[in-house]
């Protein structure tokens, strides 16, 4: 999860987030190299007294500054497209959870079970227990098995919302009348926090998301106790 004054991304918990962090580093390095080159050229222009007043064209330079940007764009586009395909691909999910956004709470339905559904509201600050996080704790957590592919179906009952959990690399819009899907896979157990990431009204910032990833045995015991 995030901590105060954090400058980087949250620790990756899913394969998708690991790929996104690698892509971030890859793209950031390209941006750094381009920025360094531009600053170097600007410094040369400001410090050197040599000028070419008679130069009308330079075919070699024009060829380079046409081909080089195209090559850089390809280096960015190829890994980006690969990650996009990975995020859309869902192979044999073991569980499907339907998520509905409301003003201003989330409701969840485990579609593989006959009667396993609940609403998830933020716990008010005056009801928090010691050690709990302000504006992030909920009364009903989403319990899911770790290390298994899970499909999330996401929609909304009223206005636009967005279901986002940064450490899992997830951000999917909840649109009324439309079902979007996302894949959830966690590499380790724990609590993972997120929030609604689309302005949805006056209490937009009071729609936290808490995923509790547990081993499969614990998930089976939890689901049996909830039915």
Swiss-Prot record:
The keyword Nucleotide-binding does not apply. One of its GO terms (molecular function) is cytochrome-c oxidase activity. Cu cation A1 binds at residues 161, 196, 200, 207. Mg(2+) binds at residue 198. It catalyses: 4 Fe(II)-[cytochrome c] + O2 + 8 H(+)(in) = 4 Fe(III)-[cytochrome c] + 2 H2O + 4 H(+)(out). Component of the cytochrome c oxidase (complex IV, CIV), a multisubunit enzyme composed of 14 subunits. The complex is composed of a catalytic core of 3 subunits MT-CO1, MT-CO2 and MT-CO3, encoded in the mitochondrial DNA, and 11 supernumerary subunits COX4I, COX5A, COX5B, COX6A, COX6B, COX6C, COX7A, COX7B, COX7C, COX8 and NDUFA4, which are encoded in the nuclear genome. PANTHER family: CYTOCHROME C OXIDASE SUBUNIT 2, CYTOCHROME C OXIDASE, SUBUNIT II. Component of the cytochrome c oxidase, the last enzyme in the mitochondrial electron transport chain which drives oxidative phosphorylation. The respiratory chain contains 3 multisubunit complexes succinate dehydrogenase (complex II, CII), ubiquinol-cytochrome c oxidoreductase (cytochrome b-c1 complex, complex III, CIII) and cytochrome c oxidase (complex IV, CIV), that cooperate to transfer electrons derived from NADH and succinate to molecular oxygen, creating an electrochemical gradient over the inner membrane that drives transmembrane transport and the ATP synthase. This is Cytochrome c oxidase subunit 2.
